[in-house]
Amino acid sequence: MKEGIHPDYREVLFIDMSNDFKFVTRSTIQTRETAEFNGKTYPLAKIEVSSESHPFYTGQQKIMDTAGRVEKFNKKFGARASGKAAK
């Protein structure tokens, strides 16, 4: 294989920010942060949803609004959606 053209494939620590679930897998993701897990330091990737928190895998229904999309929509269109037409 040619040198210098392939991404760095290494073990990376992923943390599910919704429930602090941690797992290590191999990935080419580029990160600046590191964290210690089971006595070893890994590059750190923070994720919003994993199999431990996704409703499909957990069987629980919940609204996943980590970016505040619902509040942003209600702020922008709330008056129109509730029947109060702003003119």
Swiss-Prot record:
Keywords: Ribonucleoprotein, Ribosomal protein. It comes from the Bacteria. Coiled coil: none annotated. The keyword Ribosomal protein applies. Gene3D superfamilies: Ribosomal protein L31. GO terms for biological process: translation. InterPro entries: Ribosomal_bL28/bL31-like_sf, Ribosomal_bL31, Ribosomal_bL31_B, Ribosomal_bL31_sf. GO terms for cellular component: ribonucleoprotein complex; ribosome. Pfam families: Ribosomal_L31. GO terms for molecular function: structural constituent of ribosome. NCBIfam families: L31, PRK01678.1. Part of the 50S ribosomal subunit. Belongs to the bacterial ribosomal protein bL31 family. Type B subfamily. This is Large ribosomal subunit protein bL31B. It comes from Paraburkholderia phymatum (strain DSM 17167 / CIP 108236 / LMG 21445 / STM815) (Burkholderia phymatum). The lineage of its organism: Bacteria, Pseudomonadati, Pseudomonadota, Betaproteobacteria, Burkholderiales.
